Amino acid sequence: MYVISLSYKVPMDIVDFHLADHVSWLQDAFDEGVFIAAGRKIPRTGGLLLSTTDRDSLDASLAKDPFYVNGVAEFEVMEFHANRVAPGFDNLLDN
């Protein structure tokens, strides 16, 4: 599983300029099964994505994100193996 941390590198007006395209890309990625959760950081300095796809598919998808393409955010991809989860989240366990 992967946690992807996005950190904005540009002023918020530039983030907002690219936001609609980013949201459209994000919806497509959800439809393709790349991500299982996404949201903004509080305070609004970036966002977090959660993915259970393979690394090659993840990297290919991230390369299409308008925030990446236009240099709006930097991306940190962190892999981890879940070995304990709350009830109802068994699908997140690594086998």
Each PLM stretch: what is its role?
Residues 1-95:
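Conserved, structured core segments of small domains
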